[in-house]
Amino acid sequence: HAAFTVAHEIGHLLGLSHDDSKFCEENFGSTEDKRLMSSILTSIDASKPWSKCTSATITEFLDDGHGNCLLDLPRKQIPGPEELPGQTYDASQQCNLTFGPEYSVCPGMDVCARLWCAVVRQGQMVCLTKKLPAVEGTPCGKGRICLQGKCVDKTKKKYYSTSSHGNWGSWGSWGQCSRSCGGGVQFAYRHCNNPAPKNNGRYCTGK
């Protein structure tokens, strides 16, 4: 959840509005739910995290050269930890950090798909979730860990951690014109999903 919040706030720094803002609704129509720039972050649709409003706004921002400062190389590279976060904090500890020390893992749930945390209230077990999976590397069975939302044999960690660069998919069809009379615009979209970048692989460049 922290990663989504950080991405959301960076979006504001880059000039992005909330998806339900007046600007987005006037220019791109009805609000799209479960996107990173939603005014309330609950769950994110990982297959399409950015709304049309966000995609168009950030594209215009970068095309105008306002993002050139992001190209500066860091003075010093700070290597990340070799261990996955779930190897440091198991599912029970994640429940403690998310909800409080009295919480434990809700039994019978697939923590790799969604982490449910249990607490006893008035003699009954209650399970709560932030609608997010346990972090990468969380133990999910004997010799198994969570990787990309699945419970897999931990020997496959190298396969899941191998980088691959993204490549553009096919263009979609043109959308409706933004105006019925006079000058307007039409949009067509393609996605960086052929394949999608993985494990710090480069995102597609160009338009």
Curated annotation (Swiss-Prot):
The active site is at 9. Zn(2+) binds at residues 8, 12, 18. GO terms for cellular component: extracellular region. Keywords: Disulfide bond, Extracellular matrix, Glycoprotein, Hydrolase, Metal-binding, Metalloprotease, Protease, Secreted, Zinc. It comes from the Eukaryota. Disulfide bonds join 24-53, 95-117, 106-127, 112-146, 140-151. Glycans are attached at residues 96, 168, 171, 180. Its main location: secreted. It is found in: Secreted, Extracellular space, Extracellular matrix. The precursor is cleaved by furin and PCSK7 outside of the cell. The keyword Nuclease does not apply. Residues 165-205 form the TSP type-1 domain. Binds 1 zinc ion per subunit. GO terms for molecular function: endopeptidase activity; metal ion binding; metalloendopeptidase activity; metallopeptidase activity. The spacer domain and the TSP type-1 domains are important for a tight interaction with the extracellular matrix. PANTHER family: A DISINTEGRIN AND METALLOPROTEINASE WITH THROMBOSPONDIN MOTIFS 5, ADAMTS A DISINTEGRIN AND METALLOPROTEASE WITH THROMBOSPONDIN MOTIFS PROTEASE. Metalloproteinase that plays an important role in connective tissue organization, development, inflammation and cell migration. Extracellular matrix (ECM) degrading enzyme that shows proteolytic activity toward the hyalectan group of chondroitin sulfate proteoglycans (CSPGs) including ACAN, VCAN, BCAN and NCAN. Cleavage within the hyalectans occurs at Glu-Xaa recognition motifs. Plays a role in embryonic development, including limb and cardiac morphogenesis, and skeletal muscle development through its VCAN remodeling properties. This is A disintegrin and metalloproteinase with thrombospondin motifs 5.
